[in-house]
């Protein structure tokens, strides 16, 4: 439905594994050595750690990028040599699945694209949005595509990829372990949308 070059990625969360370092091990001078995998970090998950300290830690251990931080820290992250891995736009709560949100989503996506261009980032995140009474999955998908088509040219012109995030709606044991009611919660839905 939309050019794959502009909406090419589904952002997915990673699950911690036994192979990951403990916090204590990471503080003993751990450094990524061979750089076969370019790694970045989701900043908000380290709250309440100060962002400037997080940026310095990312550089110290050899990460290449950071995302999920307040935009006011982008200049410091770039100066430290980190990429901005993903620029935010509208949140996941109010998405383009509901036409009532289109103006806001489009404005925030265009702003995200402009910010990404300014800071040398290559990706901006978008979401589907929470389920809205009276809007089924098929209509939600059509609504999303209508909104995304209004920003896709701007993204392509600036060399920015829009990344559609698929969020889990099943696990509701903690506010950030699931997103009950999120409409873009299946790979099938998201693939059909892009």
Predicted regions and their residues:
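N-terminal export signals
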Residues: 1-21
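Surface-exposed charge patches
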Residues: 30-32, 56, 75, 114, ...
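Structural motif corresponding to the early beta-alpha repeats
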Residues: 45, 61-152, 156-161
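Active-site-proximal flexible loops/turns
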Residues: 10, 74, 172-173
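Acidic/histidine-rich catalytic cores of soluble enzymes
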Residues: 55-59, 145, 149-194
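C-terminal segment of N-terminal export signals and the immediately downstream linker at the start
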Residues: 15-49, 57
